[in-house]
Each structure stands twice: as C-alpha cells, then as structure tokens.
Design a protein with these regions (language model features):
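Short loop/turn motifs at secondary-structure junctions and domain boundaries
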Residues: 51-57
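Conserved GNAT-fold acetyl-CoA-binding loop/helix
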Residues: 30-50
C-alpha cells in the first residue's frame, strides 16, 4: 500500500516568468472544455495578463506546488460584486491543489460576498467551491453561480 503525500501548495505574486506556464495551461484542449473557455492566442493572452497586472480591482496569485507553477487564482470585479476564478494545470487535477490554493487565497481576498461561476459539467470545480464554503446562488442552462457569504 502506498501512502499519498500531501502536496505543498503556496501562493505568491504573479511574475512575468509565470506567464508562459499560464499560456500553456489555458491552451490545453481538455482544460478549455472543462472550463467552457476558448483558448487565447499568445498575443491575446499577454494582453489579458497585462490587464490583470494593471487593474487595481484584481488580486492575482500564482499557485506553486513543490516549486512548480501549477496555475493561477484571481479575484476581480468591483466593490459591490467580487468574483473568484482559478486555472489549474491538468497535471494537478484531483490532488487537492485547487482546494488548498483557494483556501489560502480566501485569506487574502476577504471581501464577502464572493461569487464564482462554474459550468454544470465541471464537477471537479463544483466540489472545490463547495469544500471551501460556496453555496448555490443562481443558475442558467449552462452554469451555476455560487456564493461565499462568510
């Protein structure tokens, strides 16, 4: 019997050298389907991260696992409605990475309520959000909107 070792997950400020990893992860066809997302080309992705870096209403962190860039996590919106989003490399799916990263991020982003949108087909992300305290708020034919009130 093999023991499963807990991965060391930490967050840090986004660095320019993280961006190629982020681009690669959002280009993964399986991840794009899971998130209901059309991958950006390199130029559009660079512009996206430039907007994030220069928007005072965005909090962004790099998710690092065992010294490897595993993804990103952000909050965005305005003072009345803040949203949570994250993108995890498929190499880290199912290992608790998103849950731990979100737990850590919620210590940084303390605005409540905090909302998240998740596709109805993205069971993994639904589980992550439920584990960290998000509850159903609204839905449409394709997605759930969940909220963290406290």
């Amino acid at each position: 019997m093999t023991e499963r070792r807990a991965l060391q997950v930490r967050l840090r400020e986004v660095r320019e050298e993280d961006l190629p990893s982020f681009f690669s992860y959002q280009s993964d066809p399986a991840a794009a389907v899971m998130a209901g997302f059309v991958p950006r080309d390199a130029e559009a992705d660079a512009a996206h991260w430039h907007r994030i870096a220069t928007d005072p209403m965005v909090i962004a962190r790099t998710i690092v696992v065992e010294n490897e860039v595993a993804g990103s996590i952000v909050s965005f919106g305005n003072e009345q409605e803040r949203n949570l989003g994250y993108w995890i490399s498929s190499a880290f799916w199912g290992k608790g990475t998103a849950t731990r990263a979100a737990e850590l991020f919620l210590q940084i982003e303390t605005t409540r309520p905090l909302y998240a949108h998740v596709l109805k087909t993205n069971i993994g992300s639904q589980r992550v959000l439920a584990e960290i305290g998000f509850i159903p708020f609204d839905s449409d034919s394709e997605e759930f909107v969940v909220v963290l009130r406290q």
